[in-house]
UniProtKB/Swiss-Prot annotation:
Pathway listed: Glycolipid biosynthesis; glycosylphosphatidylinositol-anchor biosynthesis
Originating species: Emericella nidulans (strain FGSC A4 / ATCC 38163 / CBS 112.46 / NRRL 194 / M139) (Aspergillus nidulans)
Topology with respect to the bilayer: Multi-pass membrane protein
Protein name: GPI ethanolamine phosphate transferase 1
Coiled coil (UniProt feature): none
Record's subcellular location: Endoplasmic reticulum membrane
EC number(s) from the headed UniProt entry: 2.-.-.-
Amino acid sequence: MARLGRTGFLTLAVVFHLIYAYSIFDIYFVSPIVSGMRPFRVEREPGSEAPAKRLVLFVADGLRADKAFELTPDPDLPEESNGDDLTFLAPFIRSRVLSHGTFGISHTRVPTESRPGHVALIAGLYEDVSAVTTGWKLNPVNFDSVFNRSRHTWSWGSPDILLMFKEGAVPGRVDADTYGEELEDFTSDATALDIWVFDKVKELFASAKKDPELNAKLREDKNVFFLHLLGLDTTGHGYRPYSKEYLRNIKLVDQGIKEISQLVEDFYGDDKTAFVFTADHGMSDWGSHGDGHPDNTRTPLVVWGSGVAPPKQPQHGVPSGHEDGVSADWHLNQVQRNDVAQADVAALMAYLVGLDFPTNSVGQLPLEYVDGTPREKALAALANTQEVLEMYHVKEEHKKAALLRYRPFEPLASDYGNSAEQRLAMIKDLIDRGFYEDAIETSAALFATALEGLRYLQTYDWLFLRTIVTFGYVGWIAYALTTVIHLHVLHGASESDRTTASISFFSSVLVALFSVFLYQGSPWRYYLYGFFPIFFWEEVFARRKAFHAGRAGALLLPKRDLHSNKVEDIDTITYGGAFMLLTGLLYLLFEDEILGTSHQPAAVSRKGSRNIMGLQLGMVLLALIVTRSSAASLQAKQGLPFGNQVVGWGVLIASLLLPFAHRLYPNSHYLHRLMIIFLTFSPTFIILTISYEGLFYFAFCMTLVTWVRLEHATYVYTAKPVAKQAQETIEPPKKANPGATTVVDGETYRFRTLTVSDARVALFFFFLLQSAFFSTGNIASISSFSLDSVYRLIPVFNPFSQGALLILKLLIPFAIISANLGILNRRLEVAPSALFMVVMAISDVMTLNFFYMVRDEGSWLDIGTTISHFCIASFLCTFVAGLEFLSEVFISGVDFGLRTDAITASVPDIVNGITSKGQKDVPNGVEDKE
């Protein structure tokens, strides 16, 4: 309600936007996982067996497809070589492509992170995008997988991947041998991780020669061996994928795979082993992944061994797979390239070893990789299609049971003569009559239709939920504008006007919505989604007189993506730190001229404050020195010296605590307070910067100070004629408007009414807020943030601590802008939070636009970008509310040099939610207060 006042309004804004920001995951990214499906496997002739008895899966975490196949300068040559000696880094893998198996590119989905990538490879399932938040935790995999369908799986590698698959499988079915997380050091030689895995595999087969029980277990069929090779991912993060370290790691992985393949073949000696080599995701040029850039989504896929089709030469007039030009410099044009979706790999592995297809798999068996008769391929395609249809039928039954009225998917509805059972019977008849190619084509068409049916069920509730959310956002915009007009234009003069009919109407709609949610067993969040639109529009209707009295304009804000593909540059870091240091020194030297003599504090207080500021400058200098030393040591691959790490943490913590010492020697001038805040965060920005961010911080702070002074000068200039006219009038001064008051530091002050020119201030703030978001890194793609800076404090893999440091760096510009706007708010003599409320009212025009632009299919880059855009726009309002509270902390006790009127009488505080109705007139006696 408009009576909520300032604190209530800001709290409501935060709660509403946090809840509605989650709505895209309830609408667009509902988990596809269901249970209760029957498993399906390929039907084989009596006495026949699966193509392979066992399967070995190699996953090179973070390996790009191009780096695996292209010609590259030999990383082992000395530095002085001219670089003309080009070589293939993975000769063994290349030999499998050319003469032993089938290859292609496995295209991944966003988020290109380890957990979703491995889930797609091993379960054939694309998790919803929000599942990336569990990628760094030990979390049971609550869906079916190839490991779960195997007789037994042995796995080696990182605990982040192996343990979650072990916990989610049938007890005792998966063995996971992992190394400690302390080995995942980004500043050390990560090849040790892969060597550890290869050595453990060799130990297992060596032990089998002495252990008859283990030997017998290893020789059973339907076994899977999983080697998770994390070295490339760790090396790529630390040194970039074009570094010699990354290229050497590729050579080591290739040699290790060669040795393990030979070891397995020698141990069994039956040529009944299938081998799969791939990656969970790629790696960008700046050593990160997560978004949909092609370098992250293209991974190699090489399959060879028992049951795998040999390499095929491209036929004239038939697509070779190389038409897109991606593999033009791989020198593999003489071999057919067969690209697949990442989830297809799970279906391929299940087929090769004769397992049931994972029941949640949406992967389509790539028949180009299968070495079998046309009948075998037709039966395999049929079983693959039956598995997906089974998932469709189960999900459809769940949907029917939950809805008041269900409309079936026409292409698979029996009412329309298109039942899946009829089409399956037709496929079986084609196989029985020997029309295998027709059966394969029909199965593929039915498979695609089943996926469309799953898509139909996944999006069934979209229209209903999106309509509710749209009414919620539009209602918030109208409610916020009504509140601003009521509080800061009409000063509480408008009254609510509810009628019995309006109360009955809105109550009936709310009851109807809640009844539908209750019948359908909807999550508790749906009730909140439905409550907010009713609440907002009921308030807008009740305050419609205030809305009609004001004038609201639609503000369209241009927006663009900024990309920040940065590399570490010590000189640029130094320039930024030098500007920060120079700014502080110049302030200390010319403090009297900057502040003016009329605002000088007591001599003791002035000296103490200058001494503390001198210590802050010392922290800036020390941060610059230790950052240069740490960066040089890391670039020289000497690791992070322990002393540097201790000093870095000491400077970071001390610089954030030192400003509190200024309370002992207060200097209340607003420029002095801004300089303290500037120097407080300077050491943090120096330590956590890798390139131009320090220069941005300096320029951003100077721009904000200039903006504050310019807006105040503009306000004084435009108000001067009015003041002069007031002095010349012979009429007695009018009483102060009792509605235009607020409480500041325990006293009541007069504030002015908002005008059209204040929209300019709000727009400038909105622009600067966008700059704070995007200038230190493209938050639309979190992978654009480099980890180089956090290595100076945390060199060992610790995602939560490293992420916290990156978030701290990201939030600093918001702290700076909140302090400046808080000061500007007071200098312009408008009510606290007035400008913040205007910004919150206009920001959701952009939010609603991005809500309808969210996509959950198509280009993976588009999916990730649209989600990020919506979340950024939605959280902007939440940030603004938080910044408003933060600004009060930063400007507490600041002297603004204003002529404000202290009102001696006790008056209600409209901004804090009390109406002016019945308020007594305020006395004329006002007292100038500096």
